[in-house]
Amino acid sequence: MTTNKPATWFWVVSAIALVWNAMGVIAYIAQVTMSAEALQALPENERVLLQSIPTWATAAFAIAVWGGVLGSALLLIRKTWAAPVFIVSFLGILIQIVHSFFMSNSIEVYGPGGMVMPVMVLVFGAFLIWFSRKATENGWLK
């Protein structure tokens, strides 16, 4: 393994990854700390959907977003652990998507447009696995 200096775009992509995953953490915290008043203000179909999310799906959400933040931080401090952490995060994403698309009525509630963000999250999660592996191959991560 070499100790090559990362290209500038490595830092840009890593910083974007951290911001993206931090937004996921904010969404997670907003969901799990939603007040009864905020929940009641939602349309009934959205409220019922949120209240029906099983604990394991919420845990998958937590693993996905916190794993993404940790993986991004590991990229920024140039550690090879980034790739395995992103893989765990990706598994959380997959579990969440399986629940949303196949075990709940989220598509009925949000419409086909509601599939866009989860698919973007899935694609970006896969990209971060690839990116962290390439960074390791390039000797940018130790």
Where are these regions (language model features)?
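Topology signature of small-to-medium multi-pass alpha-helical membrane proteins
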Residues: 1-142
